[in-house]
């Protein structure tokens, strides 16, 4: 039997604030016991993995070696706009995805949504 990813952990400056961003981005809630020191976001629909946010004293010193790719629920443009209203910042735009950072500078990508793909022919490379 293989291991399962239970949670993904973030080191951050303000655990409750960053958890709030990701909970809103993913359509779920921050655990009611969240503090600026630690916070927990349960995956929507028990689809795992969950997210832990832990306050650490040092700021990030290098580029993320891992990031989330989010599929837009409708269009990429609308999802990028929604995430920006929550505090994310656009870093670079491409036809197939947009690179953003969350409020603490962690990289994430937003990919095309189903409405973007309607009528398009996808070719495997």
Residue ranges and their predicted role:
Residues 1-34, 42-92, 101-125:
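Glyoxalase I/VOC metalloenzyme domain signal
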Residues 38:
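A ligand-binding cleft/hinge motif common to bilobed small-molecule-binding domains
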Residues 95-97:
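Short loop/turn microsegments at loop-to-beta-strand junctions
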């Amino acid at each position: 039997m293989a291991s399962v990813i239970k949670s993904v952990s973030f080191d951050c400056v303000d655990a409750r604030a960053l958890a709030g961003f990701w909970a809103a981005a993913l359509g779920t809630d921050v655990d009611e016991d969240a503090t600026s020191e630690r916070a927990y976001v349960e995956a929507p629909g028990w689809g795992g993995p969950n997210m832990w946010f832990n306050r650490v004293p040092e700021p990030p010193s290098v580029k993320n070696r891992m990031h989330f790719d989010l599929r837009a629920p409708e269009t990429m443009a609308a999802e990028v706009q929604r995430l920006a209203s929550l505090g994310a910042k656009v870093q670079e735009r491409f036809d197939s995805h947009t690179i953003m950072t969350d409020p603490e500078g962690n990289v994430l990508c937003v990919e095309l949504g189903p409405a973007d793909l309607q009528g398009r022919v996808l070719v495997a490379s």
